[in-house]
């Protein structure tokens, strides 16, 4: 050990003190460990932040899907409610027509009883007066024939009127674009008066889906007739009316669709959804 001795004088006495210069001081290594920053402390926030961002992205995606599904379900509910109202109107109309037929049938039943009563009166008068008996018998026979005719009419006539004519009206189909436009305008006028789509379709005896399938033709002719040149005229020998309606639907651009939606909100067009998809 290298050390230097320095004499120190105190009270006329010399003292020797040894001071080591070459020795390194002994320090506890735990002190340096406690002062040095930990790497894990800086890495933990980044690791914790990445799962949070992934979780937020997943929640946003699920929320977006839920909103789209909600809007789709809302449209579906509106369509089902309109179809329900239409079916209710059809059912009420059928019940009322059945009641009217039942009332007519009940009114026609007392006829034969009156005829039988007249016949009995005629037979009673026959014993007293032959001429009155003959006249009563002839009147009874005429009345019986009229009652029989009424029965035949009730059996055949009302049934044909109730089931035949409405079916014939329902089966009437338009054959060209002009017919589609004419029918659309009639239903639109009725809708503006009655304020109900179902009642308007019932009034004209037209199915809602049938009108929805041909609506693009009428809307194109009303809102953007200049686009008819792009679509072309309808030729029944080359395509069906449904295919022509689809081509008209594809010809409606974004600007035209915005005009159509604005007119539907103001009740200047039928607020009916399309049956085609792009």
Curated annotation (Swiss-Prot):
InterPro entries: CCDC106
GO cellular component: cytosol; nucleoplasm
Chain residue ranges for the region called Disordered: 102-174
Domain of life: Eukaryota
A Pfam family this chain is assigned to: CCDC106
Main location: nucleus
Record localization: Nucleus
Residues modified as Phosphoserine: 128
Compositionally biased region (Basic and acidic residues): 102-119
Biased composition regions of type Basic residues, renumbered to the chain: 150-166
Keywords carried by this UniProt record: Coiled coil, Nucleus, Phosphoprotein
Compositional bias annotation for Low complexity: 131-144
Any coiled-coil regions, as ranges: 61-99
Short motif (Bipartite nuclear localization signal): ranges: 151-164
Annotated function: Promotes the degradation of p53/TP53 protein and inhibits its transactivity.
Record's subunit section: Interacts with p53/TP53.
Protein name (Swiss-Prot/TrEMBL): Coiled-coil domain-containing protein 106
Organism of this sequence: Bos taurus
């Amino acid at each position: 050990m290298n050390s230097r001795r320095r004499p120190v004088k105190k009270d006329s006495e010399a003292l020797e003190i040894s001071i080591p210069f070459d020795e390194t001081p002994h320090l506890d290594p735990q002190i340096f460990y406690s002062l040095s920053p930990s790497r894990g402390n800086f890495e933990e926030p980044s690791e914790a932040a990445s799962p949070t961002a992934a979780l937020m992205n997943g929640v946003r995606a699920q929320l977006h899907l839920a909103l789209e599904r909600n809007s789709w379900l809302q449209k579906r509910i509106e369509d089902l409610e309109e179809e329900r109202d239409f079916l209710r109107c059809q059912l009420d109309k059928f019940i009322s027509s059945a009641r009217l037929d039942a009332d007519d049938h009940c009114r026609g039943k007392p006829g034969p009883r009156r005829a039988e009563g007249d016949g009995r009166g005629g037979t009673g008068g026959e014993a007293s007066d032959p001429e009155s008996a003959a006249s009563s018998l002839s009147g009874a026979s005429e009345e019986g024939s009229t009652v029989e005719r009424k029965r035949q009419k009730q059996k055949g006539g009302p049934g044909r009127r109730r089931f035949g004519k409405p079916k014939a009206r329902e089966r009437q189909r338009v054959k060209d674009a002009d017919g589609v436009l004419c029918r659309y305008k009639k239903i639109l006028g009725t809708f503006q008066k009655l304020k109900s789509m179902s009642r308007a379709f019932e009034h004209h005896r037209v199915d809602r889906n049938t009108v929805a399938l041909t609506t693009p033709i009428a809307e194109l002719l009303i809102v953007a007739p200049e686009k008819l040149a792009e679509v072309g005229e309808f030729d029944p020998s080359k395509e069906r009316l449904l295919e022509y309606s689809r081509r008209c639907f594809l010809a409606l651009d974004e600007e035209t669709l915005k005009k159509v939606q604005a007119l539907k909100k103001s009740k200047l067009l039928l607020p009916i959804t399309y049956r085609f998809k792009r």
